[in-house]
């Protein structure tokens, strides 16, 4: 019966689409800049190689840490295109394509699809503070206009809107909504999302100091700022947990928790770009309106960088 075969095929395709894009640690990678403010692709290439050689499981390009909000659309698209080409299938490339304009998010997402990204990371619409119904309509429109797996990004401290567990469960019904980067800081909410969605929605921590806690609540890993300076260690926190060695995972988490928190003594990505420069890469300047940390915050954030993280 062809209709039965077709039905089984659809189920199989859905299962494939719901498989996690990655397990482990994806780096929310910085965007190295030249002194004139243009993207420094030579340094970017070196930094990507460093990440992959040290166990990073995926690259998230043009996210918050990559200063996406200060990139022009043409730069944003080119950065994703270049990154996909340079990584060349060594690890998945997840493109940050979110916007508070649904039409703009669709435009950038379609370009990322065309340029070969493996998945899309879509932050909730910021500033305009839409409702839960608005979130469902926003993500559904992007889903229907594109053909890549989608990772929802919930970071209410930056956007002013929270994806409630029930909303996440509704969005998980869409075939290509693959997961959620959960940075609400609310562990009860994470547990509720997992309870409602199960394997229909993969969960990744969006907070480096909560990697272990979110793994305990069904998480598959982390989309990480810390990985910029400690890729192997961040990967190992997740890998050891998923391999069944929870004590070793917890020990590593405890060891790197202070460093993870130090990356947020000022607004991300200000501290981490400073830290990347300290481990031997030319991260370059920030784009306005972001400015360098004052000396007190520099000392506070960088005092925790230990020898194992040095390049």
What are these language model-derived features?
Residues 1-15, 303-311:
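Single conserved hydrophobic/aromatic residue that forms the stacking wall/gate
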Residues 7, 55, 116, 146-149, ...:
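Conserved functional loop/turn residues at catalytic and ligand-binding sites
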Residues 19-27, 35-160:
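Active-site beta->alpha loop and helix N-cap motifs at the rims of alpha/beta catalytic domains
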Residues 21-32, 50, 54-56, 216-219, ...:
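C-terminal alpha-helical cap/extension of soluble enzyme domains
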């Amino acid at each position: 019966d062809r209709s039965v075969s077709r039905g089984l095929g659809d189920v199989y395709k859905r299962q494939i689409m719901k498989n996690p894009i990655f397990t482990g640690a994806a780096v929310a990678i910085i965007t190295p800049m030249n002194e004139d403010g243009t993207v420094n692709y030579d340094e970017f290439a070196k930094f990507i190689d460093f990440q992959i050689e040290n166990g990073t499981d995926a690259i998230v390009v043009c996210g918050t840490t990559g200063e996406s909000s200060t990139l022009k659309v043409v730069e944003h698209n080119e950065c994703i295109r270049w990154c996909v080409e340079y990584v060349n299938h060594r690890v998945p490339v997840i493109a940050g394509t979110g916007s508070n304009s649904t039409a703009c998010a669709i435009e950038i997402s379609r370009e990322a699809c065309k340029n070969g990204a493996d998945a899309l990371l879509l932050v909730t619409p910021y500033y305009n503070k839409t409702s839960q119904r608005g979130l469902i309509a926003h993500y559904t429109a992007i889903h229907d206009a594109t053909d890549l797996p989608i990772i929802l990004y919930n970071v209410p401290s930056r956007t002013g809107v929270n994806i409630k567990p029930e909303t996440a469960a509704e969005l998980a019904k869409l075939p290509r909504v693959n997961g959620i980067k959960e940075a609400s800081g609310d562990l009860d909410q994470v547990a509720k999302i997992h309870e409602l969605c199960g394997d229909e929605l993969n969960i990744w921590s969006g907070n480096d100091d909560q990697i272990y806690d979110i793994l305990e609540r069904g998480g598959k890993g982390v989309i990480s700022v810390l990985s910029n300076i400690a890729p192997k260690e961040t990967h190992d926190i997740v890998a050891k947990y998923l391999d069944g060695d929870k004590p070793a995972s917890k020990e590593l988490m405890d060891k790197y928790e202070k460093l993870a928190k130090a990356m947020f003594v000022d607004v991300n990505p200000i501290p981490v770009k400073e830290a990347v420069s300290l481990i031997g890469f030319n991260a370059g300047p920030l784009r306005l309106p972001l400015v360098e940390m004052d000396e007190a915050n520099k000392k506070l954030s960088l005092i925790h960088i230990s020898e194992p993280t040095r390049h």
